[in-house]
Structure formats: structure tokens, C-alpha cells
Amino acid sequence: MPNEKNVVSFRAADGNTVKLEYIDSLPSAEALAREYARSGYPDRYAVFTERQTSLSALGEVISEKDSEKGLFLSCILRPSIFPSQAGCIGPLSAVALAAALEEHTMKNIGIGWLSDIYCDGIRIGTTSVEGKLDDFTSYEYLIVSFAVKLDPKKFTPRLTDMVKQVFEDGNQSISMIMAKTVLNRFFTIYKEIKAPQKHLNHYVDRFVLKDKKIKYIDEGKKKTARVVDINKENLTLVIETKDGRRISVSSRSAVIIPNKI
């Protein structure tokens, strides 16, 4: 178990206790959370670092010399839900991260597809969800991860200044306060996971790719298309090709979405 001085407990907005372990630098918060989950760590145990050395906030593999500073947060869940009920956790985690950033920065934060986070037209972070099923087709664990690079190269300087102004609070770092805010926002939404429609509506409202040009893969070739919208029922991406055809895309690997829109 980790040294207790690196772990803080707090009551989340939904009334349940969350344990948050801080480590100043990690190759991957998600990888450590996965290791903890397999070792039996409890529900709502989160791992947080401000410096990640093997994976960027956008999910790209990096070297240690290119390590990123920011918010890298992964939380273990042990839910009593079936896979069919878990499909919306990814989009809902993006709603939580966007709301947390917006709460503290006074900036309009948008969501791409399915879980990319945008500010001022630049992709600044993402969320992800992974899990392991037990022998009864329910989850042994889920891990929900949040990542945002707090760097002027990804954030505009004005956004960085606003974050610093709001987050200065005693000895807590900017990112630590943000991590707690993200978890509070997420668990407020997560408690309604079996009836998530109003939160999915927030996802649709924050969608920023409408009318943007992206690439899609057609018979192994990259082609340009315009984003029409997202399907509000199943969150598939609706695109229009150059010849006017409309296609519904359900796989993230079938499209290439730029980091700057």
C-alpha cells in the first residue's frame, strides 16, 4: 500500500468517500491504477500525478525527455452495472472534465468525439475508460482516466493565467485542486449512470466539431469530409463526403480529427 502521507481522503459531491493518491511523477497514472485494480484496491481509489513521462495528455507515446506537466488522473471503479450500461461512461467523463475546467477557468470548454477536450479550438486533453469483466459478465473493475496538459503550448496563456489565479489555495497545487474538482464533477454524474440522458444532452451541447473538416478512412485511403453532427441517440458521428453522401461513423479509428479545429 502507498505511504499514507501521499493519500488524501475527501467526501465527493455525491456523499461518498474518495481516496486520492498523489505521486509527483509517473510513466502513466492509468497504468498504475490498472496495477492497483488488479491488486484489489477499492472502489473510488484514484491516482494523480502532475508529470507523466510515457504518455501525453492526448494519449500519444512520448519519451521521458518530452514529459508533460498537467493533470493526469485515473480512478478505480467497482460498479454494479452490466457492459450495456457502461457505454456512456466515456462521454460522461468528458462532460465532467469539461465542466471542471470551465468552473475554474471561466473559459468555454468544448468536447470533440468521443472524449476529446477542446479550448479555443485546440485539443488540450482527453478521457478514457477501460475495464475487466468477471466470470458473470459484470465488471471486476473499471478505470476512468482524465488527462489535461497545463502548458502554454496547448493552453493559451490567458487560460493558464486564469487557472493560476483561481487555484492558488494554501499549499495545494493548481492541479491537485483541479483533480478534486474533476472527481466531484464525475461522481455527481456517475450516480445517475442508469439514467444519464440529461448529462448526455450536456455532451451534445458542448460538441464542437459541427461543420468542421476531418479525414475519414475509405478503403484504406484518407478522404476529406464535413462533420454534420452527432446522432443524439447513440452518439455516432455523422459526416458528409465530398459527393454529398452522409455516413454514420461508430469507430474512432475510422476518422482522423485534427488537434486544432
Label the predicted regions:
Residues M1-E102, L133:
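N-terminal lobe of the biotin/lipoate ligase/transferase fold
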Residues Y41-D43, W113, K221:
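Short, basic and Ser/Thr-rich N-terminal targeting/leader segments
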Residues D24, I111-W113, Q197:
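Short loop/edge segments at beta-strand edges and connector loops
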Residues P2, G15, P79-I109, C119-I261:
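Long, positively charged amphipathic alpha-helical accessory segments at protein N-termini or as interdomain linkers
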